[in-house]
Amino acid sequence: IGTLYFMFGIWAGLVGTSLSLMIRTELGKPGSLLNDDQLYNVVVTAHGFIMIFFMVMPIMIGGFGNWLVPLMLGAPDMAFPRMNNMSFWLLPPSLTLLLASSAVESGAGTGWTVYPPLSSNLSHAGPSVDLAIFSLHLAGISSILGAINFITTIMNMRWEGLLMERLSLFVWSVFITAILLLLSLPVLAGAITMLLTDRNFNTTFFDPSGGGDPILYQHLFWF
């Protein structure tokens, strides 16, 4: 699975790099190249999501983690190999949803933070933002399952006599990262789910006209 993570991360990295090149050519000279601000915003948004959720996290945590953590603990495999499998296979459909979101209507041109009111159903009436939110949900589930797996593996699968203070710093870094991920990702999930209901079920979590607060989204997102 570690190898699959690497392959997936490299592929997503190539997609992200091509988006990055579009951004650089647009900004590299005066005047407009794409002649469409919405399209540029969509490229920036997709670039942010792809590079974080589909390149950096799968390669740095999924790839290196799966290869090195069991090796450094003296464990035969991760604590939950089948959950590990599921963590990986949630990513391709997630990436597909993200790419679909940029193809539907005029794409999700909200910036990678998906801030309201830019992501409200007034600014983006079509399903593009909803698809992006579903994509984030899948990527988040994958990350949370992976984090649970890493924490359990590091706590329970060490060689006898391999105390926590004798662990390599790489294992510690994965351990701490997984704990922080497990704390913060559900908050982001709550924020984007509230945004989803704002868009589709007439709630007003982030809509000032209904007593909501768009700054609340920023608090939840950046937590």
UniProtKB/Swiss-Prot annotation:
Does the record bear Transmembrane helix in its keywords? yes
Binding of Ca(2+), residues: 26, 31
Give the record's membrane topology.
Multi-pass membrane protein
Which coenzymes or cofactors are required?
heme; Cu cation
Q: What class of enzyme is it?
A: translocase
Q: Which GO terms describe its biological process?
A: electron transport coupled proton transport; mitochondrial electron transport, cytochrome c to oxygen
User: Hey, which stretches end up on the Mitochondrial matrix side?
Assistant: 1-4, 70-88, 154-173
This one is known as Cytochrome c oxidase subunit 1
- The organism of origin for this protein: Doryteuthis pealeii (Longfin inshore squid)
Gene behind the chain: COI
